[in-house]
């Protein structure tokens, strides 16, 4: 499955952002465009990308930003593999210049971002070189949470923000077997 230089959107205006699921279980997902499930007046939506091999190219943008709270972005798996229905990637690559954003922009908590590959598979590798944000709203709200996990994890050029202007900063969970 390939999304090249295109936009795939499920934005909400007064309602919560929509849901976008891209799945190629034993195949490959390649994205070099915009995938968005934002909301101008409510909570950001959810985006899930699952495949054996996931490649998010340079300057891609994936966002679930919302006024009242950030949404959910799952690339390659779920938080700590908590949802067994979500297929786990073997290789997940987020290129430099990419932005993943699950922030609240006004008065809510930041959302959740997971970039994952199967930590139990000896061939698994997660590489993240982009910017990941799950920030709390500017008026009020706590920071969200971000997880980067894989058997081998390369986060050499990553930028992370779970900050909150007036609330509590969020968390970044790093869960590799081997890290560079």
Outline where the language-model segments fall:
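Extracellular and secretory-pathway beta-repeat/beta-biased strand scaffolds
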Residues: 4-180
